[in-house]
Amino acid sequence: MTDIIATEVAPEAAEALAPVARAPLGDRPIQTVGRRKEAIVRVRIVPGSGRITCNGRELEAYFPSKVHQQLIKDPLVTTEKAETFDVIANLRGGGTTGQAGALRLAIARALIASEPDDRPALKKAGFLTRDARVKESKKYGLKKARKAPQYSKR
């Protein structure tokens, strides 16, 4: 059995190993997806003035709760890009809390796609962690996932 050891890398292989140079953001939108509970959010960020649009409505109209608005804006505020990008979001499924969490994750992922240097700050703040908690399924013989019917001794 003979062993062949390559001492030189072929030119085409060297090109394949070279890091891929990213094109500057320019005017192209960045698209990402965020999920939480049953909610799925598709986000496009484009250079702009800081407007956030959810299903064609302003953020304040779609999420009247100040808590949800703050949650959604946190990644933009952390990276100091709240006035730099416009966010266009398509939200489907779930409730308001799930949609707000999914939107926050999608915005954080989009910010990393536009500026990879922001990753440590977003990671430290916990904006890149996908919350894996979902509704527990109902079991037969029980009224809900864990709630048992009332017990009668006699």
Swiss-Prot record:
Basic residues: bias regions: 140-154
GO molecular function terms attached to this record: RNA binding; structural constituent of ribosome
Record keywords, A-Z: Ribonucleoprotein, Ribosomal protein
UniProt region (Disordered), positions on chain: 135-154
InterPro entries named in the record: Ribosomal_Su5_D2-typ_SF, Ribosomal_uS9, Ribosomal_uS9_bac/plastid, Ribosomal_uS9_CS, Ribsml_uS5_D2-typ_fold_subgr
Family classification: Belongs to the universal ribosomal protein uS9 family.
Xref: PANTHER family: RIBOSOMAL PROTEIN S9, SMALL RIBOSOMAL SUBUNIT PROTEIN US9M
Annotated protein name in UniProt: Small ribosomal subunit protein uS9
Gene name of the record: rpsI
